[in-house]
Curated annotation (Swiss-Prot):
Species for this entry: Methylibium petroleiphilum (strain ATCC BAA-1232 / LMG 22953 / PM1)
HAMAP family cross-referenced by the UniProt entry: GTP_cyclohydrol_B (MF_01527_B)
Hydrolase keyword on record: yes
Pathway info: Cofactor biosynthesis; 7,8-dihydroneopterin triphosphate biosynthesis; 7,8-dihydroneopterin triphosphate from GTP: step 1/1
InterPro entries xrefs: GTP_cyclohydrolase_FolE2, GTP_cyclohydrolase_FolE2/MptA
Classification lineage: Bacteria, Pseudomonadati, Pseudomonadota, Betaproteobacteria, Burkholderiales
Residue span of region Disordered: 1-21, 180-207
Leading EC class: hydrolase
Gene: folE2
EC nos: 3.5.4.16
Job description of the protein: Converts GTP to 7,8-dihydroneopterin triphosphate.
Protein name, UniProt field: GTP cyclohydrolase FolE2
Membership in a protein family: Belongs to the GTP cyclohydrolase IV family.
The reaction(s) this protein catalyses: GTP + H2O = 7,8-dihydroneopterin 3'-triphosphate + formate + H(+)
Residues marked May be catalytically important (site): 160
Length: 297
């Protein structure tokens, strides 16, 4: 068989997923998940390469049998190959590109990945990287517009106020995780970018801010670290260990204190809309964790 004849046969392969469906059931979300693909994220002023676990989906009308599954990966490959750094503004734009490629009016992108921030120890100033978990989530729904969320998981140190109060010396302390999921809002009056296909902007302020004032991972990390008994570092010298031990002892926090203090910082930032903050203490005197959650809708 010649290449030309093989090409001719390919052109007549039926496209089953594009057929009409008669069951009259729309699908809210259909797509691919747990797709590992490289990307570049913007952390402050730095561009950081990483590998993300992607979940991509669109809404499917009742009359359409299936979506274009291969186009999700095609879109993702093009994004990765472009080298474009992913921040909130870029994510919003890329969601519109994905929806157009799949001929969809609603859809969602979620990318979860590790990232690093270089930190300097509090006394010695020695430099090292600390790893965090981050996520970008963007969703467009007809009638409510586009929302973009930034999520971080920040490791910190907490020390128990009760243990300090009742003990002659020392107090139990542990590593804690602060998880912040924040909706990024754009400034009032900024309406320069058109909505993705399907329209339907909400009467609420559309999420995502201009790049000059955009809030990202580094700011959310600082909200968590500044609220803890002490932040932590990847590399420390003895004077640094002394400083952290004494800093935590002088700044005890219950899990309730920590989650409230983080929430207060989020409340004070006009760039943040809805949010969810969860703190988990990996209790050093128990074989279980303590946790607290605050949500703003």
């Amino acid at each position: 068989m010649t290449h030309a004849s093989a090409l001719g046969l390919t052109q007549h392969i039926p496209d089953t997923q594009s057929e009409r469906d008669e069951r009259h059931l729309a699908i809210q979300r259909v797509g691919v998940k747990e797709v590992r693909y490289p990307l570049t994220v913007r952390i402050g002023e730095q561009l950081s390469p990483t590998v993300a676990s992607w979940s991509l989906d669109v809404a499917l009308p009742a009359e359409q049998k299936g979506t274009h599954m291969s186009r999700f990966v095609a879109w993702l490959d093009a994004l990765s190959a472009s080298g474009k750094p992913l921040d909130a503004t870029a994510l919003r734009d890329e969601l519109a590109v994905m929806l157009d490629k799949l001929h969809a009016v609603e859809g969602r992108i979620e990318a979860r990945f590790p990232f690093f921030i270089r930190k300097h120890a509090p006394v010695s100033g020695v430099s090292s990287l600390l790893d965090y978990q981050g996520a970008w989530i963007a969703e467009h729904r007809a009638g409510s517009g586009t929302t973009v969320w930034c999520e971080v998981v920040v490791p910190v140190k907490s020390l128990c106020p009760c243990s300090k109060e009742i003990s002659d010396y020392g107090a139990h302390n542990q590593r804690s995780h602060v998880t912040i999921r924040a909706e990024l809002m754009e400034p009032p009056g900024d309406r320069r970018r058109p909505p993705p296909p399907g329209g339907g902007e909400s009467t609420r302020e559309r999420p995502v801010v201009d790049s000059a004032v955009e809030l990202g991972f580094e700011a959310l990390v600082r909200f968590a670290e500044a609220s803890a008994s002490s932040e932590i570092w990847g590399l420390l010298k003895r004077p640094d260990e002394k400083w952290i031990t004494e800093r935590a002892y002088e700044n005890p926090k219950f899990v309730e204190d920590l989650v409230r203090d983080v929430a207060l910082r989020l409340n004070a930032d006009a760039r943040i809309g809805r949010y969810r903050v969860e703190v988990e203490n990996f209790e050093s005197i128990h074989n279980h964790s303590a946790f607290a959650v605050i949500e703003r809708e």
